Amino acid sequence: MEHTTSKLSRRHFLETTSLAAAAVTILPSKVIAGMGYVPPSDKLNIAGIGVGGMGFNNLTNMATENIVALCDVDWNYAERNSFRKWPNAPKYQDYRVMFDKQKDIDAVMIATPDHSHALPAMLAMRAGKHVYLQKPLTHSVYEARVLAETARRYGVATQMGNQGNSGEGIRRICEWIWAGTIGEITKVDAWTNRPIWPQGLERPAKEMRVPKTLNWDLFIGPAKFRPYNEVYTPWNWRGWWDFGTGALGDMACHILDPVFKALKLKYATAVEASSTPINTESPPNAEMVTYWFPQRDNLPKVAMPEVKVTWYDGGLMPERPTELKDGEPMGDWNGGVIFHGSKGKIMCGCYAANPTLLPTSEMETFKEPEKTIRRIPNAETNGHEQDWIRAAKESKDNRVEASSNFSYAGPLTEMVLMGVLAVRLEDLKKRLLWDGENMRFANMNHSEQIRVITSNKFEVVNGDPKFNTKYDTIPALASAEEWIRHNYRDGWEQI
């Protein structure tokens, strides 16, 4: 479908079509499209890239539209669900081939491993296609910046797959904080139960035969090539630096989302991290990351002072609030957030679920402030995907952007990934000063080195423990620059 746009406002459209209603019972969809948007009754042609896992769930929530193409590097994984659900959709392993061959695609859903997010999204947006992209938005800070800029340049509808952003919980938290309910917030604690996959791993020495249904070269994509081993895919890629971003990258776009939105954050000015032993291959098993954010513009009912945000994962937790009674859960099974204000505290679970004042007894007499944020229908089911579809059908001039469009999701992802960088650079043993505008650490120099574990062996010999830990020293600044802006391997276009 080709959709033309015009400068015709939505108000003028409604006025003119209302006047015409007496004489014309039904307007053809092509006429309505010519007035500046695609009628909700028209269906988008959506292609899926990465359809074997979370991508299947996303496509299922988009099944009100035409699913016209399916692309996955692992056809065995995709066959379990997406290929069976949409057997007539053309199937591909290489999204570049899909875009070359199939010209009827209006929009794409991308749910590949983190390192393969940016390139298909860029290719789609440059072709004028709307993009739904799983979290974190990208694998690097630079990629997140470029995707947000590209979405603005091409005027496409975008959405990151942090579905809690469409929920009621994040809206209530924002409205409470903006109304001054707990006063000025200077401290936030956030945590997750992740990782629930192996981390702290060493690269396997054994090379395995690549399954016939997997295109290993395409899985590697822009990352540095390595021999195939079953430990990497289809699920545990999150536990490898080259492909994923660990527990922080996986969950912070969900858990820190209400923090970022409610406190109107952008660039942190500093970050510091500590963790269990870290190596060159895999994120640590547990980590604590602290961000410092500068003062922001005050709101009508509350000031926005400097704030410290601390992240915990791998079993690490913040101190339990004294306001919680014995037996009352702290957050939920997946994690949670506690906002510390000058007049009280707010706690929620993962995805901003079930927000409450602390102590929870305060909710008995609490009067909710006015609802000022647009609500998303069916947010607890398919609302996040459907809100993107709605935005895609509106013209860029009249569009109400989806809730986690790239202009929001890009900076959120930059914040998250800057914390990932701090973990990888923690051997510097200092607070890192972040220059957000220029995507660089301001207090690093070329002489600094970081020591990382390359091998960590342990055995018991004659009842005594024997440790054999090997280290490597790498240049800190050069490594940080590569992690901020990747150099893709040959054959993959730089962005």
Model-flagged regions — what are they?
Residues 33, 50, 54-58, 154-160, ...:
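Predominantly a Rossmann-like dinucleotide-binding segment in NAD(P)-dependent oxidoreductases
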Residues 114, 118-166, 180:
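Beta-strand-loop-alpha-helix segment that lines the small-molecule cofactor/substrate pocket
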Residues 97-103:
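Short amphipathic alpha-helix with an adjacent loop that forms part of the alpha/beta core around
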Residues 2-21:
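N-terminal secretory signal peptides and thylakoid transit peptides that target proteins
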Residues 108-109:
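N-terminal Rossmann-like NAD(P) cofactor-binding module of classical short-chain dehydrogenase/reductase
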Residues 19-86, 164-167, 259:
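N-terminal Rossmann-like dinucleotide-binding module
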Residues 37, 63-64, 71-85, 251, ...:
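Glycine-enriched catalytic-core subsegment of oxygenase/oxidase enzymes
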Residues 90-94:
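Conserved SAM-binding strand-loop segment of SAM-dependent methyltransferases
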